[in-house]
């Protein structure tokens, strides 16, 4: 929250402010953005940026654990705090994608402007559908830089096996950076723990030792970056609805158009995967569906964004 202020103090005092360990634990990402990719125009950054939530989601995916059960195990192992809100509600990931977006755009990013949704509503049933679809669910922090707009958000996302971040499991982090010339590069490694973080801190100390007599303008300016409204961001959506599919087939098609429909044996519900649409269009269609389901004593059980 005070990154811009600290960078300005460092500039005024002609000293250096290093913060490699602020994102990704031991993964080098701040310095690559500043040095190795300095000739690139960064178009997109998407990552699994929180080891705690990734551990929880991995347990739910691979072992069928409940959210509460996986969270307790993470706490017992020291991966999650006694008060895990910053992790599971997505706030930690939000602050990290804000830092990466600021590095990419060279402008100040207020993390409070970034749409943020955590993993507390994800259930073991969601993962059963994901397994049937050949997908998984990950908590993403993402920013996309277009000609006149910057989109940034944090949310659980359903991804397929072909996605580069599909196999990033447990407390590991993975970050994709797409540039205008190089294309996509991936940064992967341990995103939590004292030794990975210590590795990044020591690297900063060594870096600083090479610049004792000069100021390195690492970071961003005080100019504020405007984040585009989430309503115009486009995704596919996974939706679970109570009750059998057949009586609702026409209703679902009226609201969402062509959809992929699926069911799980033994459950009195169905799920659908929409085509790509804006957040605003999805909310309007969802509201219409919920209104009509109310008369049938049925309800929407879950919604998750998808990159499929």
What positions do the PLM features span?
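Rossmann-fold NAD(P)-binding glycine/threonine-rich loop
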Residues: 1-35
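Substrate-binding/catalytic subdomain of NAD(P)-dependent oxidoreductase enzymes
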Residues: 71-167, 172-174, 193
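Catalytic, metal-anchored helix/loop core of enzyme active sites in primary metabolism
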Residues: 44-46, 54-57, 73, 79-83, ...
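Conserved active-site and cofactor/substrate-binding residues in soluble primary-metabolism enzymes
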Residues: 24, 28, 40, 62-69, ...
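Conserved anion/nucleotide-ligand pocket segment
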Residues: 34-95, 100
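A generic structural signal for well-ordered alpha-helical segments
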Residues: 9-10, 74, 130, 251-256, ...
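Short helix-capping/linker segments at secondary-structure and domain boundaries
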Residues: 63-66, 104-111, 209-213
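A conserved regulatory-domain signal marking ACT and ACT-like small-molecule sensing domains
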Residues: 205-308
